[in-house]
Amino acid sequence: MIIFKDMITGDEMFTDSSKYKVVDDCILEVECRHVTRRMGDIQLEGANPSQEEADEGTDEVTESGLDLVLNQRLVETGFSKSDYKNYLKTYTKALQDKWKEVGMSDSQMAEAKTKFTEAVKKVLPKVGDLQFFMGESSNPDGLVALLEYRENSDGTETPVMMFFKHGLEEEKV
């Protein structure tokens, strides 16, 4: 399994168990699903609930949302277009410092910066229609994932989470 982590904060953003694709070598798009889960609902294989003690009738607590957000404990945040541009300036600086720290060569950094700029140009016009998510630590210096709802040919919508490829590191487990 591959875990995609925020390069700056180390937060887990998603894993390769999610359906994803790379767009123009600069954005990773992850398809999400709406799910509802019962809290504390653990089913042990082979367990026979009819032979167990009767449940005490506790109130059932459920959580609903996007599978990726719930699984990775992503935290929703908000930006205006101007706030998002300011965030991108500070994030780009922090990212370049991180690239140096991990030993990227000048040519690799130049290519990564070019690809990052391409990615920003793709998402900036959509900022008003996007939702924003940070990693579990809620560190404002880290990567902010972008959620877009895309219309399908049958009229339904598919939630797609976008990540800047050059802000992620892969960890194989």
UniProtKB/Swiss-Prot annotation:
Main subcellular location of this protein, as a coarse class: secreted
Annotated keywords: Secreted
Tissue: Expressed by the venom gland.
Listed Pfam families: TCTP (PF00838)
Gene Ontology MF terms in the entry: calcium ion binding
InterPro entries: Mss4-like_sf, Mss4/transl-control_tumour, TCTP, Translation_control_tumour_CS, Translational_control_tumour_p
TCTP domain segment(s): 1-173
GO cellular component: cytoplasm; extracellular region
Annotated compartments: Secreted
Family from the record: Belongs to the TCTP family.
Functional summary from the UniProt entry: Venom protein that causes edema, enhances vascular permeability and is likely related to the inflammatory activity of the venom.
Note: Secretion of this protein from cells may proceed via an ER/Golgi-independent pathway, probably mediated by secreted vesicles called exosomes.
Identification of the protein by name: Translationally-controlled tumor protein homolog
Species of origin: Grammostola rosea
